[in-house]
Amino acid sequence: MRTGYDLKTARRSLNLLTLEWQNRGLNLWTIQPGTIALTAGTSTYSLPTDTIDLIEMSLRTGSGENQIDSNLQRISVSTYSQQTNKNNQGRPTQGFVRRLATETTVTLWPVPDNTQTYTFAYYRLQGISSISEGVTGTADVPPRFVPCLVSGLAYYIAMKRPEVSDRVVALKQEYEFQFELAAGEDQESASIRFIPYSTFYTTGI
């Protein structure tokens, strides 16, 4: 038994597992708020290096009881590229998010001017912390995902061990079952109201 190697391969499998979770979609426990003070004449700003994506962004003006957050429209690269004057300054109304290999940036349009103080307020998806060395530390997952973590790790390790290849299918099924349970519970709860739309037609007699 190669104890040292087993520890390293388990750590790598765990890191790959959490990366897979990020690719599967939104994990509520990774949503983090943040703000960036905007500078007049500067259009592009870098987000924290562990940012996966932005899910909400707004332009904040004022402070205290006079603070106002205005929604910023997220636009695509094609929409941003069609702006005829990308250096036009004014009150930002749109944001173009670039998810690069080493960082995530947001480019605002119009470029912030100096007529008032602007703050970029956002909610981002934070990357799940990986395990680098050793076996100490706290797992960056909530308790409701622990069964999924355990079954997923067992499945990932089994794929590397020929002697247990006959159990891979069963372990994958258990992992998918546990993930569906956890992901189904890890959803946002909010009130919603449906109002029927009625149209009346009248005809002359």
Question: For the regions a protein language model found, what residue spans apply to each?
Answer:
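Glycine-enriched, solvent-exposed interface loops adjoining structured elements
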Residues: 1-205
